[in-house]
Every structure is written in C-alpha cells, then in structure tokens.
Amino acid sequence: MVKLAFPRELRLLTPKHFTYVFQQPQRASSPEITILGRPNELGHPRIGLTIAKKNVKRAHERNRIKRLARESFRLNQHELPPMDFVVLVRKGVAELDNRALTEALGKLWRRHCRLARAS
C-alpha cells in the first residue's frame, strides 16, 4: 500500500533550498499559479510554498491556498519526479474556488511530470 503521508522530508525548509530552485527552474504556469521545479538527488519530491500577502490579502485565503497546495502535492507525490518544487501564486488566485484550484494544481503537476520525462 502506498503511503500518502506528508512528513518533514517532503518540505523545503531553509532559504538555501528555495534559492536552489529559483536559480535554474523548470516552469509550469497557469494564469494564477506557477510551479517552479528543479531536480534533486534525494529520490523523492519536496515542496515549498510562497503565498505573498501582496497577492492574497486575507490570511484565511492564504491558508486555504496553502492547505490545498499541500494536499494536492501529498496526493500526487508518488507520480511526481524527484524534484524540488516551489508554488508561487499571482493576484486572482483567491477568486478560484477549491475545485478550480485543485484542478489547476493537478494540471501543473502533470505538466511537470511530462517536462521531467522529456529532459
């Protein structure tokens, strides 16, 4: 049975980890969300979230977006390539309902899988 946990090892925790991804990322974007990815040597994917107050004003909206992004990553972690991912959002993401946000994230995860296979 596949474990769908979200332990500490699956998170980007330090600024150094985020900087590594920002240096030479592969991008997958929608109008509201961008997911940056860069291969790692760990054998499993990791995720970091940057939800700026500038783009999403209300804390409960930022928390909802982070919660949905983590859940989407958790459910797709076994299909994802061993990469470090950073999720960035733009203005307008707060207007998306949960279903639309989940579908957009799923589409971007699939795009990263295709990009990883192509390279």
UniProtKB/Swiss-Prot annotation:
GO terms for cellular component: ribonuclease P complex. Gene3D superfamilies: 3.30.230.10. GO terms for biological process: tRNA 5'-leader removal. GO terms for molecular function: 3'-tRNA processing endoribonuclease activity; ribonuclease P activity; tRNA binding. Its EC number is 3.1.26.5. Coiled coil: none annotated. Keywords: Endonuclease, Hydrolase, Nuclease, RNA-binding, tRNA processing. It catalyses: Endonucleolytic cleavage of RNA, removing 5'-extranucleotides from tRNA precursor. Consists of a catalytic RNA component (M1 or rnpB) and a protein subunit. RNaseP catalyzes the removal of the 5'-leader sequence from pre-tRNA to produce the mature 5'-terminus. It can also cleave other RNA substrates such as 4.5S RNA. The protein component plays an auxiliary but essential role in vivo by binding to the 5'-leader sequence and broadening the substrate specificity of the ribozyme. Belongs to the RnpA family. This is Ribonuclease P protein component. It comes from Photorhabdus laumondii subsp. laumondii (strain DSM 15139 / CIP 105565 / TT01) (Photorhabdus luminescens subsp. laumondii).
